[in-house]
């Protein structure tokens, strides 16, 4: 195992193939959500149901992403990250093909839940292996750059999905997702190292419960995990609800819908690139503080503009773009601080983080949907602002200890 770790840290071609293939799998699972969302308007027409099912597809997907987090992280600690990750890539491909057999919206939503379980493998297994494979400053840069590749999904997904449903049946998207996952499997099979530290230990449910209890008793971890969830919630609520807001609510075309995503996710990528440049030069706490201003300020602009004029969707887009830059700058460092706030094995810690975040996303997207149904764009963006303010309060509590994140890259 030491040979694996040392060779990985040297960042050779084989070592770089591992994060590239992991991000290909991540891209497949993300585009499995972002590309299908504009296509959901065609899906609900196929099954003869109303548009309230559009965001529910994403809710089911993220609920699946929470379902097995508690097990996969500790399981990969004990039997190895590599076999668990490889099974995950094959599982996602299989569920993407199985959804082609559905004949009702209920069956479709159930399959979306089962597909969402594939998200569990990214944080609880894949990213834990990344964190264990590279030294800290290099790891933050790799994580930020990997995020840029993964973020092509929400940048291109809406455009590609809107174009796809005009040219091809929506079912063909899932064949594409399966093909990408199988390609990632081949690369991971060749290049993924084994980094698990507790291999061979027996998996005991009582011991597992004790591990999670110890993790959740850590206040810094709890604040960081909740903050990670509330930081990304406005973005995910936007992805889920924006087809209805833009196409049905504002009466714009699917092309306009896709183009309105470009500044938001373009700024998210710019924030990640800025983070990659500053990482190692600035303390992590400073990077988080720098990201706080555009995050909260952007959400405030979106809320104020749409409360003043319900159809100010360009101001809403501008505010969300500013917010997206902030989250790109702050989130990778926050994830790192939270993951290493506990001395427990990283598979368990990462799984606990994932469950907390996915619970916030699953519940929050549904709350955001009803906020829009009851109060339109203003209420939806006010909900997002509240999420941002909760993030700010949690960050303030987490960074109360002046030593947390003080060293550059730590």
UniProtKB/Swiss-Prot annotation:
Domain of life: Bacteria
Record topology, Cytoplasmic segments: 1-15, 74-82, 131-144, 188-226, 277-286, 335-346, 397-410
GO MF annotation list: sodium:proton antiporter activity
Swiss-Prot/TrEMBL GO biological process terms: response to antibiotic; xenobiotic detoxification by transmembrane export across the plasma membrane
CDD domains assigned to the protein according to its UniProt record, in alphabetical order: MFS_MdfA_MDR_like
Keyword annotations: Antibiotic resistance, Cell inner membrane, Cell membrane, Membrane, Transmembrane, Transmembrane helix, Transport
Main location (coarse class): membrane
Protein's membrane topology: Multi-pass membrane protein
Cellular component terms per the entry's GO annotation: plasma membrane
Family matches, as InterPro entries: MFS, MFS_dom, MFS_trans_sf, Sugar_transporter_CS
UniProt-annotated location(s): Cell inner membrane
Residue numbers on the Periplasmic membrane side: 37-52, 104-109, 166, 248-255, 308-313, 368-375
Transmembrane parts of this sequence: 16-36, 53-73, 83-103, 110-130, 145-165, 167-187, 227-247, 256-276, 287-307, 314-334, 347-367, 376-396
KW Nuclease (keyword) present: no
Keyword field contains Ligase: no
Stated family: Belongs to the major facilitator superfamily. MdfA family.
Record note on quaternary structure: Monomer.
Protein task: Efflux pump driven by the proton motive force. Confers resistance to a broad spectrum of chemically unrelated drugs.
Protein name: Multidrug transporter MdfA
Organism name: Edwardsiella ictaluri (strain 93-146)
């Amino acid at each position: 195992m030491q040979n694996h770790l040392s060779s990985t840290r040297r960042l050779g071609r084989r070592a770089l193939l591992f994060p590239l293939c992991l991000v290909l799998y991540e891209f497949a699972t993300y585009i499995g959500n972002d590309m299908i969302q504009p296509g959901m308007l065609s899906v609900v027409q196929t099954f003869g149901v109303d548009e309230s099912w559009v965001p529910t597809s994403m809710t089911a997907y993220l609920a699946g992403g929470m379902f097995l987090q508690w097990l996969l992280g500790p399981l990969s600690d004990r039997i190895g990250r590599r076999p668990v990750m490889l099974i995950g890539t094959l599982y996602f491909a299989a569920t993407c093909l199985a959804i082609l057999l559905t004949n009702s919206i209920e069956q479709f939503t159930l399959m979306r839940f089962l597909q969402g379980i594939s998200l569990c493998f990214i944080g609880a297994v894949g990213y834990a292996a990344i964190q264990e494979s590279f030294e800290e400053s290099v790891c933050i840069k790799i994580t930020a750059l990997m995020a840029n590749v993964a973020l092509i999904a929400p940048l291109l997904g809406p455009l590609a999905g809107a174009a796809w449903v005009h040219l091809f049946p929506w079912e063909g998207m899932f064949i594409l997702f399966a093909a990408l996952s199988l390609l990632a499997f081949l690369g991971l099979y060749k290049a993924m190292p084994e980094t698990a530290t507790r291999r061979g230990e027996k998996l005991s449910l009582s011991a597992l419960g004790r591990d999670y209890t110890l993790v959740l008793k850590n206040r810094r971890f709890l604040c960081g995990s909740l903050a990670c969830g509330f930081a990304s919630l406005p973005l995910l609520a936007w992805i889920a609800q924006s087809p209805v807001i833009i196409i049905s609510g504002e009466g714009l075309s699917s092309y306009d819908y896709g183009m309105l995503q470009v500044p938001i996710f373009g700024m998210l990528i710019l924030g990640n690139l800025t983070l990659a440049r500053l990482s190692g030069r600035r303390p992590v706490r400073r990077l988080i503080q720098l990201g706080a201003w555009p995050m909260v300020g952007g959400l405030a602009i979106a809320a104020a503009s749409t409360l003043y004029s319900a159809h100010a969707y360009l101001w809403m887009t501008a505010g969300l773009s500013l917010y997206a830059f902030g989250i790109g700058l702050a989130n990778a460092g926050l994830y790192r601080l939270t993951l290493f706030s506990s001395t427990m094995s990283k598979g368990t810690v990462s799984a606990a983080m994932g469950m907390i975040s996915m619970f916030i996303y699953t519940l929050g997207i549904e709350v955001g949907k009803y906020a829009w149904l009851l109060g339109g764009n203003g209420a939806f963006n006010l909900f997002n602002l509240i999420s941002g303010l909760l993030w700010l309060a949690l960050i303030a509590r987490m960074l109360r200890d002046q030593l947390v994140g003080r060293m550059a890259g730590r």
